[in-house]
Amino acid sequence: MVRYSKLAFRQLVRVYDVDVCFTPMIYAKNFIESEKCRSSELSVCEGDSPLIVQFATDDPFVLSEAAEMVYKCSTGVDLNCGCPKHDVRSKGFGSALLSKPELLADMVRQTRARIPDPDFSVSLKIRINHDIEKTVDLCRKAEAAGVTHLTVHGRTPSQRAEPIDIQALRIVKDSVSVPIIANGGITTREEALFLAEQTGVDGIMAANGLLDNPALFAGHEHTPSDCVENFMRLSREYGLDWLLYHQHLQYMLRPVFSAQQRRVFNELNGRLAIDHFLNNLLDI
Protein backbone atom coordinates (compact mmCIF):
# COMPACT_ATOMS: atom_id res chain seq x y z
CA MET A 1 0.00 0.00 0.00
CA VAL A 2 1.55 3.25 -1.10
CA ARG A 3 2.02 5.46 2.00
CA TYR A 4 -0.13 3.51 4.40
CA SER A 5 1.72 0.47 5.75
CA LYS A 6 4.16 2.40 7.92
CA LEU A 7 5.60 0.97 11.13
CA ALA A 8 2.71 1.97 13.44
CA PHE A 9 0.11 0.38 11.16
CA ARG A 10 2.21 -2.77 10.66
CA GLN A 11 2.53 -3.19 14.40
CA LEU A 12 -1.22 -2.70 14.73
CA VAL A 13 -2.25 -5.39 12.25
CA ARG A 14 0.24 -7.84 13.76
CA VAL A 15 -1.86 -7.68 16.94
CA TYR A 16 -4.83 -8.90 14.90
CA ASP A 17 -3.46 -12.09 13.30
CA VAL A 18 -1.49 -10.75 10.34
CA ASP A 19 1.48 -13.06 9.78
CA VAL A 20 3.65 -11.08 7.33
CA CYS A 21 3.76 -7.34 6.66
CA PHE A 22 4.95 -5.40 3.62
CA THR A 23 6.26 -1.84 3.62
CA PRO A 24 4.70 0.76 1.34
CA MET A 25 6.09 0.69 -2.20
CA ILE A 26 9.45 2.50 -2.22
CA TYR A 27 11.24 3.83 -5.29
CA ALA A 28 14.45 1.82 -5.15
CA LYS A 29 16.73 4.36 -6.85
CA ASN A 30 15.64 7.11 -4.47
CA PHE A 31 16.15 4.75 -1.54
CA ILE A 32 19.72 4.00 -2.62
CA GLU A 33 20.69 7.59 -3.30
CA SER A 34 18.90 9.54 -0.56
CA GLU A 35 19.41 9.27 3.18
CA LYS A 36 16.30 11.41 3.61
CA CYS A 37 14.29 8.88 1.59
CA ARG A 38 15.64 5.98 3.63
CA SER A 39 14.80 7.61 6.95
CA SER A 40 11.31 8.67 5.88
CA GLU A 41 10.32 5.53 3.98
CA LEU A 42 11.65 2.74 6.20
CA SER A 43 11.44 2.59 9.98
CA VAL A 44 11.58 -0.74 11.80
CA CYS A 45 11.64 -2.02 15.35
CA GLU A 46 12.52 -5.30 17.02
CA GLY A 47 9.01 -6.74 16.76
CA ASP A 48 8.49 -5.69 13.14
CA SER A 49 9.05 -9.12 11.62
CA PRO A 50 8.51 -10.91 9.30
CA LEU A 51 8.84 -7.79 7.13
CA ILE A 52 9.12 -7.61 3.36
CA VAL A 53 10.32 -4.35 1.81
CA GLN A 54 8.56 -3.59 -1.47
CA PHE A 55 10.47 -1.71 -4.16
CA ALA A 56 9.62 -0.17 -7.52
CA THR A 57 12.27 -0.23 -10.25
CA ASP A 58 12.96 -1.65 -13.68
CA ASP A 59 16.71 -2.04 -13.13
CA PRO A 60 18.17 -5.38 -11.93
CA PHE A 61 21.24 -3.70 -10.43
CA VAL A 62 19.15 -1.14 -8.55
CA LEU A 63 16.88 -3.82 -7.08
CA SER A 64 19.79 -5.97 -5.96
CA GLU A 65 21.56 -2.94 -4.47
CA ALA A 66 18.44 -1.88 -2.55
CA ALA A 67 17.92 -5.44 -1.36
CA GLU A 68 21.44 -5.55 0.04
CA MET A 69 20.79 -2.32 1.92
CA VAL A 70 17.73 -3.75 3.71
CA TYR A 71 19.08 -7.28 4.17
CA LYS A 72 19.85 -6.90 7.87
CA CYS A 73 16.59 -5.16 8.84
CA SER A 74 14.04 -7.23 6.90
CA THR A 75 13.18 -10.77 5.89
CA GLY A 76 12.87 -10.14 2.16
CA VAL A 77 12.25 -7.81 -0.76
CA ASP A 78 9.33 -7.68 -3.16
CA LEU A 79 9.23 -6.08 -6.59
CA ASN A 80 5.98 -4.27 -7.35
CA CYS A 81 4.85 -5.41 -10.81
CA GLY A 82 1.17 -4.79 -10.25
CA CYS A 83 0.53 -1.13 -9.48
CA PRO A 84 -1.83 0.21 -12.18
CA LYS A 85 -1.45 3.91 -11.36
CA HIS A 86 -0.43 6.10 -14.28
CA ASP A 87 2.41 7.89 -12.49
CA VAL A 88 4.00 4.54 -11.62
CA ARG A 89 3.45 2.97 -15.04
CA SER A 90 4.81 6.05 -16.81
CA LYS A 91 8.18 5.40 -15.16
CA GLY A 92 8.17 1.86 -16.50
CA PHE A 93 7.41 0.44 -13.04
CA GLY A 94 4.47 -1.42 -11.53
CA SER A 95 2.19 -3.18 -13.99
CA ALA A 96 4.20 -1.79 -16.92
CA LEU A 97 6.66 -4.59 -16.12
CA LEU A 98 4.14 -7.37 -16.76
CA SER A 99 4.99 -7.35 -20.47
CA LYS A 100 8.68 -7.98 -19.69
CA PRO A 101 8.93 -11.46 -18.11
CA GLU A 102 12.59 -11.90 -19.11
CA LEU A 103 13.53 -8.64 -17.38
CA LEU A 104 11.63 -9.68 -14.25
CA ALA A 105 13.41 -13.03 -14.23
CA ASP A 106 16.76 -11.24 -14.55
CA MET A 107 15.89 -8.95 -11.65
CA VAL A 108 15.07 -11.95 -9.48
CA ARG A 109 18.21 -13.76 -10.62
CA GLN A 110 20.56 -10.85 -9.92
CA THR A 111 19.02 -10.11 -6.54
CA ARG A 112 19.23 -13.73 -5.50
CA ALA A 113 22.86 -13.85 -6.65
CA ARG A 114 23.63 -10.78 -4.54
CA ILE A 115 21.90 -12.27 -1.47
CA PRO A 116 22.08 -16.08 -1.59
CA ASP A 117 20.66 -16.46 1.95
CA PRO A 118 17.68 -18.84 1.52
CA ASP A 119 15.97 -17.28 4.55
CA PHE A 120 15.80 -13.93 2.73
CA SER A 121 12.91 -13.90 0.27
CA VAL A 122 12.92 -12.37 -3.21
CA SER A 123 9.37 -12.09 -4.52
CA LEU A 124 7.18 -10.44 -7.14
CA LYS A 125 3.71 -8.92 -6.82
CA ILE A 126 1.83 -9.10 -10.11
CA ARG A 127 -1.60 -8.76 -11.69
CA ILE A 128 -3.10 -11.25 -14.10
CA ASN A 129 -3.14 -10.82 -17.88
CA HIS A 130 -6.29 -11.18 -19.98
CA ASP A 131 -4.36 -14.04 -21.59
CA ILE A 132 -3.71 -16.23 -18.55
CA GLU A 133 -1.02 -18.17 -20.42
CA LYS A 134 1.10 -15.02 -20.42
CA THR A 135 0.75 -14.84 -16.65
CA VAL A 136 1.70 -18.50 -16.33
CA ASP A 137 4.74 -17.94 -18.55
CA LEU A 138 5.85 -14.99 -16.41
CA CYS A 139 5.45 -17.01 -13.22
CA ARG A 140 7.38 -19.96 -14.60
CA LYS A 141 10.23 -17.72 -15.72
CA ALA A 142 10.34 -16.13 -12.27
CA GLU A 143 10.32 -19.55 -10.64
CA ALA A 144 13.23 -20.71 -12.81
CA ALA A 145 15.14 -17.56 -11.82
CA GLY A 146 14.77 -18.37 -8.11
CA VAL A 147 11.77 -16.37 -6.93
CA THR A 148 10.73 -17.30 -3.38
CA HIS A 149 7.01 -16.70 -3.78
CA LEU A 150 4.57 -14.78 -5.96
CA THR A 151 1.70 -12.53 -4.90
CA VAL A 152 -0.99 -12.52 -7.58
CA HIS A 153 -3.74 -9.90 -7.68
CA GLY A 154 -6.75 -11.50 -9.33
CA ARG A 155 -7.55 -8.54 -11.59
CA THR A 156 -5.92 -7.13 -14.70
CA PRO A 157 -4.21 -3.71 -14.54
CA SER A 158 -7.24 -2.08 -16.16
CA GLN A 159 -9.72 -3.50 -13.65
CA ARG A 160 -10.60 -1.79 -10.39
CA ALA A 161 -13.67 -3.03 -8.48
CA GLU A 162 -14.59 -5.98 -10.68
CA PRO A 163 -14.74 -9.41 -8.99
CA ILE A 164 -11.37 -11.14 -8.87
CA ASP A 165 -10.78 -14.02 -11.29
CA ILE A 166 -10.76 -17.11 -9.08
CA GLN A 167 -10.18 -19.47 -11.99
CA ALA A 168 -7.10 -17.51 -13.09
CA LEU A 169 -5.67 -17.70 -9.57
CA ARG A 170 -6.28 -21.44 -9.52
CA ILE A 171 -4.51 -21.87 -12.88
CA VAL A 172 -1.48 -19.94 -11.67
CA LYS A 173 -1.35 -21.95 -8.45
CA ASP A 174 -1.45 -25.21 -10.40
CA SER A 175 1.25 -24.07 -12.84
CA VAL A 176 4.18 -23.46 -10.48
CA SER A 177 5.60 -25.04 -7.35
CA VAL A 178 6.57 -21.88 -5.44
CA PRO A 179 4.06 -20.53 -2.90
CA ILE A 180 1.31 -18.32 -4.32
CA ILE A 181 -0.35 -15.56 -2.31
CA ALA A 182 -3.72 -14.37 -3.61
CA ASN A 183 -4.71 -10.72 -3.40
CA GLY A 184 -7.68 -8.57 -4.33
CA GLY A 185 -11.06 -7.66 -2.87
CA ILE A 186 -10.67 -9.25 0.57
CA THR A 187 -12.81 -7.46 3.16
CA THR A 188 -13.56 -10.22 5.71
CA ARG A 189 -11.89 -13.27 7.20
CA GLU A 190 -14.60 -15.43 5.66
CA GLU A 191 -13.77 -14.11 2.19
CA ALA A 192 -10.10 -14.90 2.78
CA LEU A 193 -10.88 -18.46 3.84
CA PHE A 194 -13.23 -18.95 0.88
CA LEU A 195 -10.63 -17.69 -1.60
CA ALA A 196 -7.98 -19.98 -0.14
CA GLU A 197 -10.35 -22.94 -0.35
CA GLN A 198 -11.38 -22.18 -3.93
CA THR A 199 -7.88 -21.63 -5.29
CA GLY A 200 -5.59 -23.74 -3.12
CA VAL A 201 -3.20 -20.82 -2.68
CA ASP A 202 -0.68 -20.72 0.13
CA GLY A 203 -1.62 -17.35 1.58
CA ILE A 204 -3.99 -14.40 1.34
CA MET A 205 -2.99 -10.73 1.19
CA ALA A 206 -5.34 -7.88 2.07
CA ALA A 207 -4.65 -4.20 1.49
CA ASN A 208 -7.68 -1.90 1.25
CA GLY A 209 -9.67 -4.29 3.43
CA LEU A 210 -7.13 -3.84 6.22
CA LEU A 211 -7.29 -0.07 5.90
CA ASP A 212 -11.02 -0.24 6.60
CA ASN A 213 -10.64 -2.90 9.28
CA PRO A 214 -7.14 -3.67 10.65
CA ALA A 215 -8.70 -6.51 12.69
CA LEU A 216 -10.08 -8.24 9.58
CA PHE A 217 -8.00 -11.41 9.90
CA ALA A 218 -8.97 -11.77 13.56
CA GLY A 219 -12.58 -12.15 12.47
CA HIS A 220 -13.97 -8.72 13.38
CA GLU A 221 -16.67 -7.42 11.06
CA HIS A 222 -15.70 -3.79 11.70
CA THR A 223 -12.78 -2.09 13.42
CA PRO A 224 -13.25 -2.73 17.17
CA SER A 225 -12.75 0.11 19.64
CA ASP A 226 -9.69 -1.56 21.18
CA CYS A 227 -8.09 -1.55 17.73
CA VAL A 228 -8.60 2.21 17.46
CA GLU A 229 -7.12 2.68 20.93
CA ASN A 230 -4.13 0.52 20.01
CA PHE A 231 -3.61 2.56 16.86
CA MET A 232 -3.69 5.81 18.82
CA ARG A 233 -1.03 4.45 21.18
CA LEU A 234 1.20 2.99 18.45
CA SER A 235 0.98 6.16 16.37
CA ARG A 236 2.26 8.19 19.32
CA GLU A 237 4.93 5.62 20.09
CA TYR A 238 6.31 5.51 16.56
CA GLY A 239 5.72 9.13 15.59
CA LEU A 240 3.29 8.62 12.73
CA ASP A 241 2.64 11.84 10.82
CA TRP A 242 -0.68 13.30 11.95
CA LEU A 243 -2.04 13.65 8.42
CA LEU A 244 -1.49 9.95 7.79
CA TYR A 245 -2.86 9.21 11.26
CA HIS A 246 -5.99 11.17 10.35
CA GLN A 247 -6.40 9.36 7.03
CA HIS A 248 -6.08 5.93 8.64
CA LEU A 249 -8.76 6.78 11.17
CA GLN A 250 -11.09 8.06 8.45
CA TYR A 251 -10.91 4.60 6.88
CA MET A 252 -11.28 2.70 10.16
CA LEU A 253 -14.20 4.68 11.55
CA ARG A 254 -16.18 5.20 8.35
CA PRO A 255 -18.82 2.56 9.26
CA VAL A 256 -19.47 3.94 12.76
CA PHE A 257 -19.55 7.67 12.08
CA SER A 258 -22.82 9.47 11.53
CA ALA A 259 -22.81 11.94 8.63
CA GLN A 260 -22.38 14.80 11.10
CA GLN A 261 -19.54 13.09 12.97
CA ARG A 262 -17.80 12.37 9.67
CA ARG A 263 -17.97 16.01 8.61
CA VAL A 264 -16.59 17.20 11.94
CA PHE A 265 -13.83 14.59 12.03
CA ASN A 266 -12.72 15.25 8.45
CA GLU A 267 -12.17 18.92 9.28
CA LEU A 268 -10.04 18.32 12.39
CA ASN A 269 -6.53 19.77 12.31
CA GLY A 270 -3.70 18.25 14.34
CA ARG A 271 -3.23 15.21 16.55
CA LEU A 272 -4.53 16.86 19.72
CA ALA A 273 -7.85 17.72 18.11
CA ILE A 274 -8.15 14.22 16.66
CA ASP A 275 -7.38 12.54 19.97
CA HIS A 276 -9.79 14.78 21.86
CA PHE A 277 -12.57 13.86 19.42
CA LEU A 278 -11.78 10.14 19.72
CA ASN A 279 -11.54 10.23 23.50
CA ASN A 280 -15.08 11.58 23.64
CA LEU A 281 -16.35 9.20 20.96
CA LEU A 282 -14.83 6.09 22.51
CA ASP A 283 -15.14 7.23 26.15
CA ILE A 284 -11.44 6.57 26.78
UniProtKB/Swiss-Prot annotation:
Protein's organism: Caenorhabditis elegans
CDD domains, per the entry: DUS_like_FMN
Protein name (record): Uncharacterized tRNA-dihydrouridine synthase-like protein C45G9.2
Domain of life: Eukaryota
UniProt key word Flavoprotein: yes
Keywords: Flavoprotein, FMN, Oxidoreductase, tRNA processing
Family classification: Belongs to the Dus family.
Cofactor requirement: FMN
Residues that, per the record, bind FMN: 54, 125, 153, 183-185, 207-208
Function summary: Catalyzes the synthesis of dihydrouridine, a modified base found in the D-loop of most tRNAs.
UniProt xrefs under InterPro entries: Aldolase_TIM, DUS-like_FMN-bd, DUS_fam, tRNA_hU_synthase_CS
